[in-house]
Amino acid sequence: MGYSYTEKKRIRKDFGKRPQVLNVPYLLTIQLDSFEKFIQRDPEGQQGLEAAFRSVFPIVSNNGSTELQYVSYKLGEPVFDVRECQIRGTTFAAPLRVNLRLVSYDRDAAPGTIKDIKEQDVYMGEIPLMTDNGTFVINGTERVIVSQLHRSPGVFFDSDKGKTHSSGKVLYNARIIPYRGSWLDFEFDPKDNLFARIDRRRKLPATIILRALGYSTEEILDLFFEKIQFEIQDNKLLMALVPERLRGETASFDIEANGKVYVERGRRITARHIRTLEKDNVTKIDVPTEYIVGKVSAKDYIDLESGELVCPANMEISLDILAKLAQAGYKSIETLFTNDLDFGPYISETLRVDPSSDRLSALVEIYRMMRPGEPPTKEAAEALFDNLFFSAERYDLSAVGRMKFNRSLGLAEGVGNGVLSKEDIVGVMKKLIDIRNGRGEVDDIDHLGNRRIRSVGEMAENQFRIGLVRVERAVKERLSLGDLDAVTPQDLINAKPVSAAVKEFFGSSQLSQFMDQNNPLSEVTHKRRISALGPGGLTRERAGFEVRDVHPTHYGRVCPIETPEGPNIGLINSLSVYARTNNYGFLETPYRKVVDGQVTEEIEYLSAIEEGNYVIAQANASLDEDFRFTDAFVTCRGEHGESGLYRPEEIQYMDVSPQQVVSVAAALIPFLEHDDANRALMGANMQRQAVPTLRADKPLVGTGMEKPIALDSGVAVVAKRGGIIQYVDASRIVVKVNEDETIPGEAGIDIYNLIKYTRSNQNTCINQIPCVNLGEPIGRGEVLADGPSTDLGELALGQNIRVAFMPWNGYNFEDSMLVSERVVQQDRFTTIHIQELSCVARDTKLGAEEITADIPNVGETALSKLDESGIVYVGAEVKGGDILVGKVTPKGETQLTPEEKLLRAIFGEKASDVKDSSLRVPNSVSGTVIDVQVFTRDGVEKDKRALEIEEMQLKEAKKDIAEELEILEAGLFSRVRNLLIDGGVDAKELDRLDRTKWLEQTLNDEAKQNQLEQLAEQYEELRKDFEHKLEVKRGKIIQGDDLAPGVLKVVKVYLAVKRRIQPGDKMAGRHGNKGVISKINPVEDMPYDENGQPVEIVLNPLGVPSRMNIGQILETHLGLAAKGIGEQINRMLKEKQEIEKLRGYIQKAYDLGGGSQKVDLNTFTDEEVMRLAQNLRKGMPLATPVFDGAEEKEIKDLLELGGLPTSGQITLYDGRTGEKFERPVTVGYMYMLKLNHLVDDKMHARSTGSYSLVTQQPLGGKAQFGGQRFGEMEVWALEAYGAAYTLQEMLTVKSDDVNGRTKMYKNIVSGTHQMDPGTPESFNVIMKEIRSLGINIDLDEE
C-alpha cells in the first residue's frame, strides 16, 4: 500500500495475518446519527422533532370550531460557539421557532367552511445541540447521553420456570409491550385457567377481554377449539372420526367399523392403529351413549318450539340433556375436542370462572378493575376500554413493535398499524395456548433480538413529545374559553413546559452523564456505552444473573469483556468495534458473504434476529488464494449460536475481523488472547483512567487500534482538506489548500486554532501541540496537532518502561512496584492537573458583597499576590490557605460598647461591619495561577481587572481576525497575481503597484477578466466579513454576562498543579496488572544489565501465575525486541553507516514474520528513510492485533534481529553490591499507565473539624474534613490487648463526649495533661431511641 508523507514518518509494523477487509467505522456514529435524525427535516415525519409535532398537532377545540395546525419548524443559529459556552457556563443550544396556523371554522355555514386563518412563528424554547464530537455542553460542562438497551416493544412469551407455585408447575404467560400505552398480560394460573392483567393490576379471566371485544361464548369457543360431530340415529350415537385425535388414548370401547374391530377395548391406541384407520378410510364409528357424557357443547341448543335453551354453549352434556336434545329434534351435536396431552380445555374452563355474560358486563368489570370506587356508566366503560388499546393517541406499538409482533405471530410484515386489533389479541392468546399445549417455545428475554438500543435522538424526541402534550392540554383549555378573534398562536402557546422537559432530560436524566474526560479513550468509550439502567430500564437491585450474563447474540455487537466491576456488572456494556444500530434500533454486526464455499468481497450487516438462521465461520478460518476454505470441516456458529463443524459449502457468512467481538478499549490490549477474562476486564477499564502524561509516548507494543481511536476521539486536530503547511506556531496552523480541493473563487486557506492548557471534566489538562513542520505536504484527514495522550496521531496513554520481573527486598510485595528515580527525573509520569475555583459575589439582605483588596484583619503578606481589584495575578504561585480573590460580606450591625463608639468617633473607622469571605486555596492544594475570568452582571460596573481582561481579549480577537484576513488576502492576491501574469501583465510592473490596484487591471481574455472580477468581489466580501466578524466578537466580549439570580459577579481562577510520580500513586499495565508504588529507589541501587543499563521498574513475578494474564510477559518480550531493533538503528545512525545498509536492516525488520502488511522501503527516498530511522531510534512500534497477533516464533526472530537473547531473559546485577543475581531475569519494555488515583488527592489528616449533629461524632471522608473511623473490629482489638485506657479515650473524648473533649482541649492548651471522660453522646441517642419505643430508661447516678 502507498503511504502518505505523514504516514511515512513512523510506520507501525503489523503482525496481523489477515488483511483488513473492512476499516474500523467512525466510532461516534451511534451518537451523531441519532441526533441528526432528531433535528433533521424529515418529510415523512417518521422520526425526530417533525414526528413529535405531527403526533400532537393539530389541536382541536372541544367544540371543533377552531384548530391549531402545525406547518413547519426551523432551528436558528446558536448565539455562542462551543468554546464560549464552556467558558461562560451556558448551554450550547439553538432557538426553535415553529410555524403554526390557527384556523377558525364558520359554525353557521357548511361543515369545513373556514372563517379565519392566522399564521405565525412561535418561539418554542431552545434545543441543546450536539458538538462535532457527540457531546452536549449543558451549563458549561460537557455531558454525554448514554444509549439505553431496553426491552423492544412487541409481544413476548415467557414462563415462570416453575418458581411461582409450590408444586413446581410451569406457568406460561404472554405480554404485549407497546412503545407507549398500557401493557396487556395473559397468564395461566396453577389450575390452568387463563387470566389477563392490564398494566400489572388485578387479574381478570382472559375471556372478559374477548367478551369486551364483542365475542359471544359460541364465537369464543369457535376461535379456540376443534369440534367433534356426534349424530343421533335410532338411539345410537355416531361419531365423526379424525383418527389422528385418538393418538395415545386408551379405547374405552371396541372401535369397529364395517364389521371389523380396529382397536379392542382397554388397548392403548398407537400410530399403527391410526394408520390402519386412515388406510381403510374410516370416517364414522359407533360410540356408546355414555361416551358423550362429560363432553362440552360447542354452541347453544334451543328448543325451537318452546324457545327454551336446552343446552347452552360450554355446558357439559349429561344423558338427561342428550335425551332433551333428541326430543327437541336435533340430529347432530357439536362438542369441543380436548385432551390432556396437546389440546387442553383452558378457555372452556376459564369461561366457567368468568363472571360476565355479555359485552356490557365485561366492560363494567374492566372499568371496576381500572378505576376502583368509581360508579361505571356504559359510555365511560366503553370509552375507557377503547382508549386502552385502540386509540392512536394513547397507544402506540411503534414500527418496531409492530414488526416484532407480526414476526412473533407469523403474520406478514406490513399487516396492522400502531394500535391493537381484535385479531391481534386473539392471535396472542392462541399462541400462548399453543405453547401451553407443547407446540412452540417461550422467548429468550436476553436475546439481542428482543432488546433494542434507544439513543439520544429518540430519548430527546420522547421528552419533547411529553412537553408538547403538556402544552396541548393548556391550548385545548384556552381554545374552549371562546373569544378567539383577537388571539394569535403566540398567545395560545406557552413554551415553558417544552423547554422545561428538554432541559430536565439533558440536565438531570440518569442517562445524561458528566463526560468522562480523563483521556481520549475514556471519551470514546463513554459515547459508545450502552446502559440497561435508566428510565424505562432495569434497576440494579432487580436485575438478576441472566440479564447481566454474556449471551451468544452479544457476539460482534456488545463486548463480552468491558463492563464495570461492582453492582453494575453486566448492566452497563460497551459497543463492539464494528457494531451499529439498524433502523429499528437493533444492533447489527458485519459479515462477509460466502457463496458456494468461496468468501466474497460483499459485506452484509446482520441483526441478532437474522443471524440465528445462518451458518457463520470465524474470521480465523484458513482460506486459500481464491478465498476458499482449505479445511474439509470448519468450526462455525450454526443455528441458535451453537458452535459445530460444517462443510465449506454449508457456510453462508464469515466474520469480518478477529477483533469484531470486542470493544474499542479491549481491542487496545495486545495479546488479549493470552489474558484471563477477569484481568482483561480490569485492563480495559483501567486504560480509561490513565492520566495524560506531560510528554505522550506511543506504545512500542500496540494493536493497530491506536490510530482510529485518536482520530475519532476529536482531541487531535485533523486536516479538513489537503495542502501545504504555510504557517505553524504553538497556537495556530495555517494550511494552503491544494488547488483541486478548493471551490472556485475562494482564498483556499484553512486556519486551525489550537486549544491551549484548558481544563477537562476530570481536572486533567487539555493541550494541543502541532506535529507538522513548515512546508510539509499533508493530506485530508491527517493529523496536524496532537491532543492530550496522542503521539503523531496515535493514542498514547502511558509510557514505555524498562521492567524486570524479580523480587527486590519485599518492596514489590502484594503487587506494589519499585520505581527508579530516573523515571521521576525524566518526568516520565509527570502530569498537569488544572483546577477551577470560583468566587461568587451576591446581593445579600444586608447589602451587596464586594470583591476588593481591602479586607479587614488581614496582613500585607496575605494580600501580596492580589492586584488592586482584589484578584490574584496570573502566574502567582499559591499554596493552601492563600487568598485568591478578596471578598467582604456585610454583617448585621452589632451593639457597640461606649469605648468602641469613642474610638469610632475619633478615628472614623467603619471597617468592622464587614466580614472576610475571601476565596482561599484549599488546604491540600498548591499550584500556579494560569488564568482568571471575571463575569459581571449587566448593569453592574466592571472593575479594573475585568476591563483589563476585556481589553486583552479584544486585542487578541482583533489580532486573530487580522492575521486570518492577512493570510486569506495573501492567498487571494497570489491567485490574482498568477491570473494577471497569465493574462500578459508584466510581473515587475505588478510588484511596483499597490496590491489593491491589481484588482483594477483589465485583461483582454474575457474568461480571465471574469475570474478577476470574481476575485475582486471576493476581496470585498472578505473585508466586509472581517468587519462583521470583529463587530460580533466585540459585542460578545463587551456585553454583560447572564448570571444566576442574585449574583453580581463571578470570578473564576484556574490553578495548574504539576504532579510528579510518588509512593502511593497507582499504576497499571494494560493487562489488569495494577499496583501501588512502594518506593522510589536511587538509580544506582536498581538492578542493571551487563551494559550497565538499569531497569526502571521492578515488578513482582508472583503477580502473574495466579492472575493468568500472561499477555504482560509476551508484551514485555516483544517490547524488548522492539527496543533492541531501535537500538540497532540508533547505532547505525551514530556510526553514520551508508543509507542502503540502514534501509536494508529496517526492511528486514518490517519483512519479518507472517504479517499481511507489506512495507516496501524501495519506494521511499533517502530523506524519507532517514526521517523514518530517526523516529525508530527509540524503538520500532509494533502492532499485534487482538486474536491475530504475534506468535512465539516471530517474537524470538525479532529478538534475534535486535541482537538479544531469544529467551527474553537477561543476567542482572544488584545495584547495591554489584553481585550477579543467581539466575537470568525477564527484562523488557512494558507500557505502563499512571491512573487517576493519586495519593495527593487521597492523603488527609484531621485536626479540629465538624461533627455530626445527632451523634456528635466527627464526620467521615476527605471532603468533609472527616476523622478516621475506629470501628467495631478495632474496638475488639483494643479489648483483646486489654488496653482499657486507650479504649476509653477512643470512645469518649476522641469521639462524641462533648463536654469531655472541650475540657480536654482546654487542658492541653493550659498545659495540664489530664482527662476526665463523661458520657458519650451516642449513649444518650440510644436512650432516647429506647424511650421512643415507650420504655422509660434512666441513669442512676450513684
UniProtKB/Swiss-Prot annotation:
GO cellular-component term (any):
DNA-directed RNA polymerase complex
Q: Which reaction does it catalyse?
A: RNA(n) + a ribonucleoside 5'-triphosphate = RNA(n+1) + diphosphate
What's one Pfam family the UniProt record gives for this protein? RNA_pol_Rpb2_3
UniProt GO molecular function: DNA binding; DNA-directed RNA polymerase activity; ribonucleoside binding
In terms of PROSITE patterns, this protein maps to:
RNA_POL_BETA
Q: What class of enzyme is it?
A: transferase
Asked whether the keyword Nucleotidyltransferase is assigned, the reply is yes
UniProt keyword terms in alphabetical order: DNA-directed RNA polymerase, Nucleotidyltransferase, Transcription, Transferase
Entry's InterPro entries? DNA-dir_RNA_pol_bsu_ext_1_sf, DNA-dir_RNA_pol_bsu_external_1, DNA-dir_RNA_pol_su2, DNA-dir_RNAP_su2_dom, DNA-dir_RNAP_su2_hyb_sf, RNA_pol_bsu_bac, RNA_pol_bsu_CS, RNA_pol_bsu_protrusion
Q: List the disulfide bonds.
A: none
Question: Alphabetically, which GO biological process terms does the record hold?
Answer: DNA-templated transcription
Q: What is its EC number?
A: 2.7.7.6
Protein purpose: DNA-dependent RNA polymerase catalyzes the transcription of DNA into RNA using the four ribonucleoside triphosphates as substrates.
What is known about its subunit structure? The RNAP catalytic core consists of 2 alpha, 1 beta, 1 beta' and 1 omega subunit. When a sigma factor is associated with the core the holoenzyme is formed, which can initiate transcription.
Q: Write out the similarity annotation.
A: Belongs to the RNA polymerase beta chain family.
What is the protein named? DNA-directed RNA polymerase subunit beta
Which organism is the protein's source? Mannheimia succiniciproducens (strain KCTC 0769BP / MBEL55E)
The organism that produces this protein has a lineage beginning with: Bacteria, Pseudomonadati, Pseudomonadota, Gammaproteobacteria, Pasteurellales
